[in-house]
Amino acid sequence: MRLSTAQLIAIAYYMLSIGATVPQVDGQGETEEALIQKRSYDYYQEPCDDYPQQQQQQEPCDYPQQQQQEEPCDYPQQQPQEPCDYPQQPQEPCDYPQQPQEPCDYPQQPQEPCDNPPQPDVPCDNPPQPDVPCDNPPQPDVPCDNPPQPDVPCDNPPQPDQPDDNPPIPNIPTDWIPNIPTDWIPDIPEKPTTPATTPNIPATTTTSESSSSSSSSSSSTTPKTSASTTPESSVPATTPNTSVPTTSSESTTPATSPESSVPVTSGSSILATTSESSSAPATTPNTSVPTTTTEAKSSSTPLTTTTEHDTTVVTVTSCSNSVCTESEVTTGVIVITSKDTIYTTYCPLTETTPVSTAPATETPTGTVSTSTEQSTTVITVTSCSESSCTESEVTTGVVVVTSEETVYTTFCPLTENTPGTDSTPEASIPPMETIPAGSEPSMPAGETSPAVPKSDVPATESAPVPEMTPAGSQPSIPAGETSPAVPKSDVSATESAPAPEMTPAGTETKPAAPKSSAPATEPSPVAPGTESAPAGPGASSSPKSSVLASETSPIAPGAETAPAGSSGAITIPESSAVVSTTEGAIPTTLESVPLMQPSANYSSVAPISTFEGAGNNMRLTFGAAIIGIAAFLI
């Protein structure tokens, strides 16, 4: 069957008309998609077809107006005006020609250096001065007189002969050092000594007198040794018998001065030796020898040597309260030597500090008890409140009583008295409680009520443990509410401490007072926001339609404890909100998981993909129909 041209044109027109309606389906789908977006996310995105109209009509039209009228017009006004001010500034440099007038004064100043030519005439007087140094050649003749002076030091060679006599000196003090008392050393500078001036005359005479006849004669030898640092100044007497050196000093002459001490050795008889200056005329020609008397007592009494030293009187002036008083203090050293040597030294004290000690009371009974009273301090405490002050006295001190056992008691004043009957509510330490599915309803989040203290809490409560409540077990909680805690009457000794409770979304929470068996079957949508997924040990899967909200509320302690050891995966159904409940004082940080939120009001419009798929299917269907009709007609 063949069709006419008119029929073919009509069929083609019909086909084109059918094909023209297909984009309307796409446009309808885009419009409905925009409506869905507006309902779900509260914003509306305009179709892409509207952008060309905005760019061509509104935006391009605004820019020519701004660039051509406002902005370019302002610059010509600002720039020409500012440069116009610069020609006025060159007027300031016009003042500089006036300043060069000041340098005109400098030609006048060079006239002053013109006065210097007369000054060079003054240095001309210096040539006569070089003639003055010419007088110095006679001065070198003066040092020529020094050659006779070296002849004077030539007289010194006889002087080295004098130090030649000194070698015996170092040998002399070694024998006398142990016999010299050390107490005399500070008195050495007080008495001047006269050195011997005649070293060439040896001492050969010694006069010794004995008060009584003795069976053994004393032989005296006079070697050239001396008892001091001056050579040939004193003569020691030595005998083969045992010697006891005794010295009685009649003057304050130090022991190290020459001719001051002469040791005397005697046998069993009493021997007194007196050395005078007349008996040894050659030893000390220019100094006087003090008389040294040595007495040896009988052998039955111990020998005692008493030496009197110089004493010093110190005047101490003490001033206090504008009044000064003077006191004399005598200082010195007294040494008494017997079988035992005792040294007593007196040192004045500048300040006297009284020391007071309380006597210890001792009981005569078998147990020894000592009570010591320490000094007490009275402290006045002034307390002010509401414009009124009160004073109170507090006595502090320490009392120590020692018996068989030592007990220390210390009193310390307290600044504030805290009554011991105060008790802190223990609502922040509720026991860990796992709520099974459908066991207890919770309260909406966002409402905060104070926790009631427990009446009985054992001391063996453990650390906080996260609490997981299965999904769909409780009515949903709107985010931001806090449920109050209900006091617990009796808790066993093995209950755990506060634990964060994880409540699945989609359930409504009410105060956990008495348990109720109301099923949790009321899902309610939650506004979109930041969702938090619980970070627990078990794997928790939440679909896109669920929203997690964070809630902080103290747990409602109950008498029923469900097993909390199950770590299986918790599956949260769609259209549910997982609410994280942190109980006690231990916050729980939850991991944020962005989820999709469906529209609050369900729309009868299908998703965009449905319309896109429908459009594509319609195009394919119409194309196949057209091809079939064309093939059928041809």
From Swiss-Prot:
Swiss-Prot/TrEMBL GO biological process terms: adhesion of symbiont to host; adhesion of symbiont to host endothelial cell; biological process involved in interaction with host; cell adhesion; cell adhesion involved in biofilm formation; cell adhesion involved in single-species biofilm formation in or on host organism; cell-cell adhesion; fungal-type cell wall organization
Main location: secreted
Signal peptide location: 1-27
Coiled-coil intervals: none
Record GO terms (molecular function): cell adhesion molecule binding
Domain of life: Eukaryota
Mutant lacking the gene: phenotype: Reduces the overall mating frequency in both liquid and solid media. Impairs stable attachments to human buccal epithelial cells and reduces capacity to cause systemic candidiasis in mice. Produces a thin biofilm that lacks much of the hyphal mass found in the wild type cell.
Region spans: 14 X 10 AA tandem repeats of [EVIQ]-P-[CDT]-D-[YNW]-P-[PQ]-[QI]-[QP]-[QDN]: 46-187
Lipid-bearing positions (GPI-anchor amidated glycine): G613
Misc. remarks from the entry: As a major cell surface protein expressed during infection, HWP1 detection can be used for diagnosis of invasive candidiasis. HWP1 epitopes can also be used to develop vaccines for protection against candidiasis.
Function: Major hyphal cell wall protein which plays a role of adhesin and is required for mating, normal hyphal development, cell-to-cell adhesive functions necessary for biofilm integrity, attachment to host, and virulence. Promotes interactions with host and bacterial molecules, thus leading to effective colonization within polymicrobial communities.
Protein name from the UniProt record: Hyphal wall protein 1
Organism of derivation: Candida albicans (strain SC5314 / ATCC MYA-2876)
Lineage: Eukaryota, Fungi, Dikarya, Ascomycota, Saccharomycotina
Name of the coding gene: HWP1
